[in-house]
Amino acid sequence: MSIFPAQPSDKKAVEEGAAFMPRFDASGLITAIVTDARDGELLMVAHMNEEALRLTLETGIAHYWSRSRKTLWKKGETSGNLQSVVELRTDCDQDALWLKVHVAGDGPTCHTGRRSCFYRQVVSSGGKVALTMASDHDQ
């Protein structure tokens, strides 16, 4: 049984009410956008299932669901770069989350060792599309 109430058919209650009623997709997941609480930089996009969201709320440490490994994932548990949640928001229809976090340790969030998973820019030129390193990426 879910600790989160089901969404009512009343759209206004979902969009304007005070009840947190996350809407998980058909796979039982909700998208989580993660930014650095200090400077707002986009760090990563991940997914949470109900258990990951519950653990995040209970512990204050971000937990996610790994779609590739099909397992719960406490971000930074291996590297020491745990994500302490400073603020958690939901969007208007409660089907996406925004976590503002402080990253412990030496700071990389991406498994490649970079601060952000968004280190490449999509460039379209002369009918061709390619990836280039973003000018503000971290090594």
From Swiss-Prot:
It comes from the Bacteria. It comes from Brucella abortus (strain S19). It is found in: Cytoplasm. Keywords: Amino-acid biosynthesis, Cytoplasm, Histidine biosynthesis, Hydrolase, Magnesium, Metal-binding, Zinc. This is Phosphoribosyl-AMP cyclohydrolase. It is an enzyme of class 3 (hydrolase). The keyword Transport does not apply. Disulfide bonds: none annotated. Catalyzes the hydrolysis of the adenine ring of phosphoribosyl-AMP. Its EC number is 3.5.4.19. Homodimer. GO terms for cellular component: cytoplasm.
